[in-house]
Amino acid sequence: MGIRAIVVDTAGTTTDLNFIQQTLFPYSAKVMADFLREHQHNPLVDYCIGDVRDIALETDADIDRVAEILVQWIAEDRKVTPLKTLQGLIWKQGYANDEFKGHIYPDFIDAIKTYRAQGLRVYSFSSGSVDAQKLLFSHSDSGDLTELFNGHFDTRTGNKLDKQAYANIVNTISLTPRQILFVSDVVEELKAAEAAGMITCQMVREPSQRTGKYRIIQSFSELNFE
């Protein structure tokens, strides 16, 4: 049957990890407290604030304390939905104000155009929210790439280290697991995707990166589906 869809990780795969860690994360930490104070009556922000209180078991935490918790979670790279939702809202503000452009590796930009021309479907799966992924790809340093994607998945689909998340993706896009290629730089994510039956491939952008028993590529140009 062959590959009919490609699911790509973002940080470290389509996007320089340094952009996430040195630009996006610090920006969200810097403005978090002010953002919460300004938007605390927005229903979505208010819901996220309540979710943070519940997860942290601090139901009486005021806005400043909630901001402290969130900044700590950013430092710990916690993959919790309220944090990722709030970061997406904050980054939307940053992109709109031209604080930064989304970094996308040039080889992926060329590749995704080729994949779509070949009739392949392309999806992204990230611990960042779907909205944050759309922002990244719509405000990239090479323009708006969102029309080239068939969809995006985030923590609402499941934890990226959990087999069930990939099974959920398989069910959502209505293909068999062996018709889907998952590309990531993280060995544990590849292991979970493989357990769900997907074909896997590891992106190795850095020589010091930990590798596993998977096919290794250093660029999307090395993937050919003709």
From Swiss-Prot:
Q: Which UniProt keywords apply?
A: Amino-acid biosynthesis, Hydrolase, Magnesium, Metal-binding, Methionine biosynthesis
Which InterPro entries does the record associate with it? Answer: Enolase-ppase_E1 (IPR023943), HAD-like_sf (IPR036412), HAD-SF_hydro_IA (IPR006439), HAD_sf (IPR023214)
One Gene Ontology BP term is: L-methionine salvage from methylthioadenosine
- Keyword Oxidoreductase listed? The answer is no
E.C. number, please? 3.1.3.77
EC class name: hydrolase
Q: Which GO terms describe its molecular function?
A: 2,3-diketo-5-methylthiopentyl-1-phosphate enolase activity; 2-hydroxy-3-keto-5-methylthiopentenyl-1-phosphate phosphatase activity; acireductone synthase activity; magnesium ion binding
Q: Which SUPFAM superfamilies match?
A: HAD-like
The cofactor(s) it depends on are: Mg(2+)
Instruction: Outline what the protein does.
Output: Bifunctional enzyme that catalyzes the enolization of 2,3-diketo-5-methylthiopentyl-1-phosphate (DK-MTP-1-P) into the intermediate 2-hydroxy-3-keto-5-methylthiopentenyl-1-phosphate (HK-MTPenyl-1-P), which is then dephosphorylated to form the acireductone 1,2-dihydroxy-3-keto-5-methylthiopentene (DHK-MTPene).
Assembly and binders: Monomer.
Similarity field: Belongs to the HAD-like hydrolase superfamily. MasA/MtnC family.
Output this protein's name: Enolase-phosphatase E1
